[in-house]
Amino acid sequence: MFNPLKLIPTGVSTKQDKTDLGFASAALRVPTGLFILNSGLGKFKADKQTAEFLQGMAASGMPFVKEMDAENFAKLLATAETGLGAALLLPFVPNRLVGLGLIGFSGGLLSMYFANDAMTESDGIRPSQDGTSLAKDSWLAGIGAALAALPKK
């Protein structure tokens, strides 16, 4: 009879196990880090109109953002995204730390998605045509959770 408990590691790890974890970590971190880093670097060039758009979108999920100056918000967002992207690409930053950072970042994106009725269908879950661009960011939460759950090296 199949026993799923036999699939759980017993704590003894081999060099191959550590290599596999390194590959899994890199496969999660590199494309995500490059994507977020590129997005953050692009926001440093945001003009006033773009900064106001970014602030308005963020304020739909996090109302306290309205109190900030739009251009300062855009710079803060650019810095945060660039920092998170860079941290994902630096192998000495622990998986758990970057995973938690990614979960927080994804939470901010998803708060905009769920707070804006135009982003979802009438059921409040499935994305509308307008909401697809934000709903797809749910994969960031999954990657963050996977990184946070990886065992220490």
Q: Where is each model-derived feature located?
A:
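Membrane-interface extramembranous regions
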Residues: 1-83, 90-153
